[in-house]
Structures are given as structure tokens and as C-alpha cells.
Amino acid sequence: MGMSVNSDPAALVPEITLLVSAVTGLLAGAWTPRERQGTIHVLAALATVVGLVATALAARQPDETVFGTYVLDTATHTTRAIVLVAVLALIALSRDTVAGHKRETEFVVLLQLGALGSIALAGAGDLIMLFAAFLLASVPFYALAGWAKQGRATEAALKYYLAGALAGVTTAAGVTILFGVAGATDYEKVADGISRGPAAAAAVGLIAVLAGLAFKAGAVPAHFWVPDIAEGTPPPVAAALTTVPKIGALVAFYRLLDTAIPAAAIDWRLITAVLATAGMTLGNLAAFAQTSALRMLGYSTVSQVGYLLMAVAVAGRTPLAQPALLLYLAAYALTNIAGFAVVATTHEHRIDRYRGLFHRDPLLALALTVALLGLVGTPPTAVFVGKLEIFTAAMDGGLAWLVVIAALNTLASLFYYLRWITPAFRPAEDDSAAVTPPSRWARAVALTTAALTLLLGIGSGIVLNALGASG
């Protein structure tokens, strides 16, 4: 890949730390009394902090590959940071939900293993590594989806697993076909092989692999599990499953197409642009009629993936594409977690039940407003800057028609987000109605992530410079 090859496992400190923490937590949890299993949360939180420090140090080093299959570059380092921050927020968000639960340890362990798979997806520079990372980012999250063992959660988990099983088989078939066409698994060698091999067979293999990555990202047409998971599982689980795997999957999407698939052999730009259009449009249309806050957030994540795929569609055509994708992913992770954290705080799943929220808890109502207007892309939130950068990259990459569609979808999305925001600032119809006490940890996460999305938006220029954006 034109990079030096590093055979020192020390280059993988963030990944190793997550793995060791997960295994240690699993073993310790089996012997720790239920009332003391909060120590597993502390261990996991410390592991994420160590991983973030190691990531910051590693980001100063030149780009390289580890064992020739795992790429350490700006995209991988940024993915590490985003995923680890998301895991830290999710550990805190889950505290009120899982404390004292008989499967408390399992939640944290599965979250860490799934996060490890997401990071591995982003760094994969080899087809075999890509498939192994796909499995690691899948199996723990299947189990996490059914963690609560409630009726709706079990149904959602079963749908998620069955769709994932099909996606896994499809991905394996695609990897096999691409290997057969190219005669190699290293991305750069795959690109050379595809240039000389039968384009039709390579296209079939590529579509199969992209179908698997689309499932992990929750992109159309492999998005059907997203609203069911969002509504059927506890909010911390829903937040994890609609945030963490998407990050790695979209970076993997970008790296695979930009490095391994020659656009001259297969017109993957058009394929990706069509997926982006379908995602943002169908996600918005489905969200319009929702009365469930969680289901609305689920469809919202589908539309957000559509916008993110715009950057993938112009990969390699403009230097703005990768920084825009990475900034948007960071902004999306914070904003999406903030939305689910508000629901976890209030314990209210219906939009009309948020009436009077501002009078009961002004700060939480403001956090909800920041989260939802952030998902629209309203300044000064980070999603606004991320979306603006992606629109600019798409224009620079010659996809002006896609920018027009995205702008129209952005305006349309304001309608259903306002349907949730407006009741929060109206007086409650019945002040004497019983209100469930808010979850302390979830409220703290909602306020913190909402504040961070504003800070990231304000400081986005510094972040973009660090990510290598030009101009």
C-alpha cells in the first residue's frame, strides 16, 4: 500500500486494550457479586481512556500497515477516537439501566467486543481482514440486541440476527468472488487484479461485499432492522447498535472503494450515489409518520447514512471527501447518542409525552433541541459543518445533482424533528400527571454529548485541519 509494514503488536495498543478489558471483565464478572459489578464499568471506562491516549500518540506516527493487513492512518486513528468516545458515553448511559441486572457484565463486554470489531473494520486493508472484522462487529451486537430478554427486544434481536446471517453469507461470497477475480486479498493487489480480470464477475463480488457493509451501516436497502432495534431494545442498547457499527462500516466502505476497486472497471460511484439518495429519501419519508420517538430516531439514522455515503461516492475524486466523512461521523455519533440519552432520561417513548419538558427540566429540553436540530444540520452544531463539508466535497467531485437532493431532504427532515421539539416547549396539559424520575447518568450523558456537538461544531476548523482538509 506504499506504506511501511510494522510487525510490532504495540502498534495495536487501543485494540489490545479493548480486548483485554473485555476478557478481563468477562472473567471477573463471573466471580464478582452482583452489587459490586459496577467495577467492570470502571475497568471498561479506564480501558477506553487508555485507548484514547494511545490513539493520540499513534496519530503522530507516519502511516503504516500492521502485518500487511491492517492500516494505521488518519482514517483508522479517527475511527479509534470516535468509537472509544462513543463507548465511554454508552458505558455511562447504560449505568442506570444495567446496574444490578443479572447480565450487567455481559452488556459492557459485548459493547467492547463490538466496538473492537468496528475499529477493525475501519482499518482493514485486506479482504480476509475485512471479513474477520465484519464478524467481530456482528456477533457481539447480535447478543447485545437480545440482552434485555424482553418480548420486543427478543423479536428485534431475532430479526437483526437473521438479516445479519444473510449479510454475513453475502459478504463471504463477495470476498470469495473478488479473490477469485483478483488472485489476491491485499487491497492494492485486488485493484490490479480487477483491472485485468472480468469486470462483470468483479461487479458481482463487489455488490455482495457492499451489501454486507450496507447492513452494518444500516444503509438502504439493508436497513430494515434499524427501526425495530431502535424501538424494541432499551435506549442504551439502541444507541450502541445505531452508532458504533456504522462508524467502522462507513470507513470500511470508503477504504474498500477508494483503494481496492478501480472506478474505471466498475462504476461504484453511481452505485454509492444511488444508495445515498435512497437512504436519505426513504429514511426521511418513513420518519414523517412516526409517533414513537425511538422509531423516529431509528429512521433518522437511516437518512444520516445516506448523507454520509455522499462522501464515499466521491472518494478519490476530491481531497475533501475523507475529512468530511470523518468529521460527520464524529458529529453523528455524539448527536445520535444525545437523542437516545434524552429518551433514556425521561423514560418516555412517545413524542406527545414530551409536552412540558422545558418546564420540568429546561436543560434537558435544550439538550433535546440541540440533538434534533443537530441531526437536521443546524449551525453551530457539528453535523452542520460535517454536512456542509460533505456537500462541498460532492460538488467538488462532480455530483451536484446529489447535493440538490440532499439539500431538499435536509429541509424536509426539519418537519419531523420539529414535531418532537415543539411539544417540549409547550405547557403540560396535566401538571398533576405522574412523571417518572429522570435517570441521573442518562441525563448527564445527554447534556454532555449535546454540549460536545456544539463545541465540535465551533472548533470544527481545527478538527478539519488535523484531518487533512485542504482549503
UniProtKB/Swiss-Prot annotation:
Protein species of origin: Streptomyces griseus subsp. griseus (strain JCM 4626 / CBS 651.72 / NBRC 13350 / KCC S-0626 / ISP 5235)
Membrane topology: Multi-pass membrane protein
Catalyzed reactions: a quinone + NADH + 5 H(+)(in) = a quinol + NAD(+) + 4 H(+)(out)
Pfam families referenced in this protein's UniProt entry, alphabetically: Proton_antipo_M
Subunit (UniProt): NDH-1 is composed of 14 different subunits. Subunits NuoA, H, J, K, L, M, N constitute the membrane sector of the complex.
Lineage: Bacteria, Bacillati, Actinomycetota, Actinomycetes, Kitasatosporales
GO BP annotation list: ATP synthesis coupled electron transport
Record-level GO cellular component terms: plasma membrane
Similarity remark: Belongs to the complex I subunit 2 family.
Keyword Transmembrane helix: yes
EC number(s) on file: 7.1.1.-
GO molecular function: NADH dehydrogenase (ubiquinone) activity; NADH:ubiquinone reductase (non-electrogenic) activity; quinone binding
The name this protein goes by in its record: NADH-quinone oxidoreductase subunit N 1
Top-level enzyme category: translocase
